[in-house]
UniProtKB/Swiss-Prot annotation:
Component of the cytochrome c oxidase (complex IV, CIV), a multisubunit enzyme composed of a catalytic core of 3 subunits and several supernumerary subunits. The complex exists as a monomer or a dimer and forms supercomplexes (SCs) in the inner mitochondrial membrane with ubiquinol-cytochrome c oxidoreductase (cytochrome b-c1 complex, complex III, CIII). GO terms for biological process: mitochondrial electron transport, cytochrome c to oxygen. Gene3D superfamilies: Cytochrome c oxidase, subunit III, four-helix bundle (1.20.120.80). Its main location: mitochondrion. The gene is COIII. This is Cytochrome c oxidase subunit 3. The keyword Mitochondrion applies. Keywords: Membrane, Mitochondrion, Mitochondrion inner membrane, Translocase, Transmembrane, Transmembrane helix. InterPro entries: Cyt_c/ubiquinol_Oxase_su3 (IPR024791), Cyt_c_oxase_su3_dom (IPR033945), Cyt_c_oxidase-like_su3 (IPR000298), Cyt_c_oxidase_su3-like_sf (IPR035973), Cyt_c_oxidase_su3_a-hlx (IPR013833). GO terms for cellular component: mitochondrial inner membrane. Belongs to the cytochrome c oxidase subunit 3 family. It is a multi-pass membrane protein. GO terms for molecular function: cytochrome-c oxidase activity.
Amino acid sequence: AGNRTEAVQALFLTVALGIYFTILQAWEYYDSPFTIADSVYGSTFFVATGFHGLHVINSTTFLLVCLFRLINFHFSAHHHFGFEAAAWYWDFVDVVVAFSLYMHIWWGS
């Protein structure tokens, strides 16, 4: 069945990294010396990273569903739109974050 084993492994790793990122972000929030109510910086930080975190959670959930579907042979070489849509969403989140970071750095300089 082609590269199914490699696809399962790669998708598992992607989901694991998404979960790891979410845990690190929660830890960062817990350990932060400021709150959302402290200043404009705190508000901006928590809103920007919070929206990104929510999108990562959504993306990870979509990819986790795709992983279960892949393991259960729900995808084929011609029938895999759910996975393709989840992958596009995951990449969209990456592009938005890259643009957002660039804009914050540019505006901050």
